[in-house]
Structure formats: structure tokens, C-alpha cells
Regions:
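Pre-Walker A adenine-sensing motif
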Residues: 2-16
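Hydrophobic anchor at the beta1->P-loop junction of P-loop NTPases
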Residues: 23
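Conserved lysine of the Walker
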Residues: 31
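Hydrophobic positions on the alpha1 helix immediately C-terminal to the Walker A/P-loop
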Residues: 34, 38
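Short glycine-rich substrate-engagement loop in P-loop NTPases that contacts/grips substrate
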Residues: 53-83
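Short regulatory helix/loop adjacent to the ATP-binding pocket of P-loop NTPases
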Residues: 121-137, 152-153
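Accessory nucleic acid-recognition modules appended to NTPase machines
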Residues: 180-339
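Catalytic cores of nucleic-acid endonucleases
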Residues: 323-324, 347-391
Length: 399
């Protein structure tokens, strides 16, 4: 088991607090392993094995049509005697109404509760009803580059060679743990994707025309890091003689978000200081999904690098937007409490770097500004703007 300390550290302040700790992220991102780490942390604090109840709620682990009442009864019957129990409940979204059972357990005062899930419906209005102010959400992502290096301590490859591998193979832990050729790695990722689609989207939402759903997904993946709308997808599909309503496309995008396959990135108007509700971008929960679905192509690199930087900013707790500064675009405006950073991303700086450096120079404030590049020869400082190699950006202690 490779330790992922960031998540354990995120949980530590809330141990023994009357809050449900929710760890949510795409399937196979390592949530169950993080549970094992939390279990070890509890044991180091003196909690006995008999006081830690771990339960999986995947399709293979529980009876079909299990109810919240059955779940509650099963857990309370296992809490024998007085004292506190620690409940680690994995993939809990498979139990309809789980939040009612968890709320009752929490109100009983004897349970410290941790849950994982692979669907953002974990954060539905039902939770607002039953757990208002009584939960903390900890997003779980696939491996950062720093974590990827931890998984590869036995590798003889250089840091930059491992970065190239990370760019091509992504950060699903199961892939990083192996030593796979590209075809095998993408087969694994393709299997993860199709499991998510079949279980969390097609089956759950009763999609009849999977061919249309698959075509919408392909459009989104092909246009990763580009602005588009449901209307523009509909128009494009009409050009292929495929008919689908804009409402259906909105639903498909929402369900992909809920399953953590994609993340939306809204535009932020730096002049008006407001979020724009049109022409957002989408990024994938792991860059390997793009290659698994479309095949590897070095020409995709610009969008892939953007995706990697976007996820790194999200991991660090930033709220990430596309920046609009009059007619100029900034790849990312990232806010975290009273902090802000601006980031442009490119494979290498062109001879005329007006878009990368010039666009940032037009922003007249004191916040840090970066150009992140894959070309080490481009790095340095230009007019106060830090031009940094991708690996250095991903491994930096702070921005």
C-alpha cells in the first residue's frame, strides 16, 4: 500500500468530530486505499480493531435493493456494548436513502463516520435536508505527479522521463503500480471508464440510445480544454445527421460530472468580477481517459497539459476558472480564500509569446502569475512573470 499523506492529513482535524467525513471521486482513484490509511491512523491513536467497522456497499458486496433501514440495523447490531465506534462505509451511494441512516447513527452520538462515493449525488439535496452543517467533503483525485513519483521509487527513469510517462499514462493508482506498456495501460483505463458508464450512467439513468451518448462523450473528450455549449454539440451532431435534443445533452454532461468523469470550468470576467454562465470548458478526471478513448496522439498535448495543471490546482484546494480579460483569455484564474494565481499553459513558448506572457502582463494586480511549459529552455522570469517547467510547477510546495 503506497501512502497518500495529503488525504490522511485532510481527515485528521475532523477525527472524533460530530461530522460525516465524505471522500468523493472517480472510481478507482484510490478511495478504498485511503480508508485503509484512515484505519491505520485510528489504530495509531489507540482505537481497537473491534471498534472499527469497515463495510463495502458495491453491487458485489451487498444484497440487491438493500434499504437504508437494513443498513442502519446491520450497523447498530454490530455496535456491541458501550463506547464509540468508527464506521468506514465504502461506496455508500449504492444504498438509496443512506443519508437518513447515517444521520440517525450520527445523532446517536456513538459513531464517528467516514464514507466514500463515486457519484456527486452524494452531495444531493437529500444531504442538505438530513446532514446540513454536519459533513465535510474531501474530494479525491487520481495521483498527483508528486504521488506518482512516490509510486515509482524503484524506477530507474529520470524525473522528466517519469513526467513523460505521467503525461501519457495518467494517475490512476492501478496503472501507476504496474509497469505497463501503453496498450495495456489504456485497456485498464478503458475498463474503468466503461464500468463507470455502465453502472453509474447508462443503467442508473436508463439511457436507451447509448450510441448518441457515446458520440457526445467523444465530442467532449475531443474538445477537452476548448469552450463549447450543449447547443454547439447539438449543431455538430446534426451535421453528422444525428438528432438529439439540447436537454438530453445537458443531462449527459450533468451525469458525466456526477460520475466524476469530467469537471466543468466556468469563465470568470476579470473586469466585471463575475462568473460567466456560457461557453465553459470541460476537463477530464484523468488525462489517460483521453488516450484510452481516442488513442495516443502527441498533437493532443496542449489540451492534456492544461488538464494536468487544472487538476493540480483543484487538488490544492483552488476554485478554478477560465479568465476573460477584455478580449484576452487566461487559461486559469485560481482562487483559494484570499489567494489568487494566474496560469498560462503551453508546450513551449513561441517566438512571439504575446498570448502567454503578454496576456498576463495586462492584468494589473499583485497576485502571482505563471507560464507553465514543457520546455526547460524557456524557464525564467519575464516582466515579473514566472516561466516554470511543468514538473517544477507540479512539485512546488506552494504557488
Amino acid at each position: 500500500m503506497i501512502y497518500r499523506p495529503d488525504y490522511v492529513e485532510a481527515v485528521k482535524p475532523f477525527i472524533d468530530q460530530p461530522l460525516v467525513k465524505i471522500l468523493a471521486g472517480v472510481r478507482r482513484s484510490g478511495k478504498s486505499t485511503i480508508f485503509e490509511m484512515i484505519r491505520e491512523e485510528l489504530k495509531q491513536r489507540g482505537v481497537g480493531d473491534d471498534r472499527i467497522l469497515m463495510k463495502k456497499y458495491t453491487e458485489m458486496d451487498v444484497p440487491e435493493n438493500i434499504t437504508a433501514k437494513q443498513m442502519y440495523d446491520e450497523l447498530t447490531s454490530a455496535m456491541i456494548g458501550e463506547g464509540r465506534y468508527y464506521l468506514l462505509l465504502d461506496e455508500i451511494q449504492e444504498v438509496p436513502g443512506w443519508e437518513k441512516a447515517v444521520n440517525s447513527l450520527l445523532e446517536g452520538g456513538r459513531a464517528d463516520i467516514y464514507v466514500t462515493g463515486s457519484n456527486s449525488k452524494l452531495m444531493s439535496s437529500e444531504i442538505s435536508t438530513y446532514l446540513t452543517g454536519r459533513y465535510i467533503l474531501i474530494p479525491v483525485y487520481t495521483l498527483s505527479f508528486r504521488e506518482y513519483l512516490d509510486f515509482k521509487t524503484d524506477s530507474k527513469l529520470s524525473r522528466n522521463e517519469l513526467l513523460d510517462e505521467y503525461i501519457r499514462f495518467g494517475g490512476f493508482p492501478i496503472v501507476a503500480l504496474g509497469n505497463y506498456e501503453a496498450q495495456s495501460a489504456y485497456q485498464i483505463v478503458d475498463g474503468i471508464y466503461h464500468t463507470v458508464v455502465s453502472r453509474d450512467i447508462v443503467k442508473r439513468h436508463r439511457i436507451n440510445r447509448q450510441d448518441l451518448f457515446d458520440r457526445v462523450v467523444k465530442f467532449v473528450v475531443e474538445n477537452m480544454g476548448k469552450t463549447f455549449s450543449a447547443n454547439s454539440i447539438s449543431t455538430f451532431l446534426k451535421s453528422e445527421h444525428r438528432t438529439i435534443s439540447v436537454e438530453s445533452i445537458y443531462n449527459y454532461l450533468r451525469w458525466l460530472e456526477q460520475a466524476f468523469i469530467i469537471y466543468p470550468c466556468e469563465r470568470y470576467d476579470l473586469q466585471g468580477k463575475s462568473i460567466l454562465k456560457t461557453q465553459e470548458k470541460y476537463y477530464l478526471s484523468d488525462v489517460s481517459l483521453k488516450y484510452a478513448l481516442l488513442g495516443y496522439n502527441r498533437k493532443m498535448l496542449d489540451g492534456v497539459l492544461e488538464n494536468i495543471v487544472y487538476l493540480e490546482l483543484k487538488r490544492r484546494g483552488y476554485e478554478v476558472f477560465i479568465g476573460k480579460n477584455n478580449t484576452k483569455e487566461i487559461d486559469f484564474v485560481a482562487n483559494r480564500r484570499d489567494e489568487r494565481v494566474y496560469v498560462q499553459v503551453c508546450v513551449q513558448l513561441p517566438d512571439n509569446s504575446d498570448r502567454e506572457v503578454g496576456n498576463l502582463m495586462e492584468i494589473k494586480d499583485h497576485y502571482p502569475k505563471y507560464v507553465v511549459t514543457l520546455n526547460e529552455m524557456d524557464t525564467g522570469i519575464e516582466n515579473g512573470i514566472r516561466i516554470v517547467h511543468l514538473a517544477d510547477f507540479l512539485l512546488s510546495e506552494q504557488l
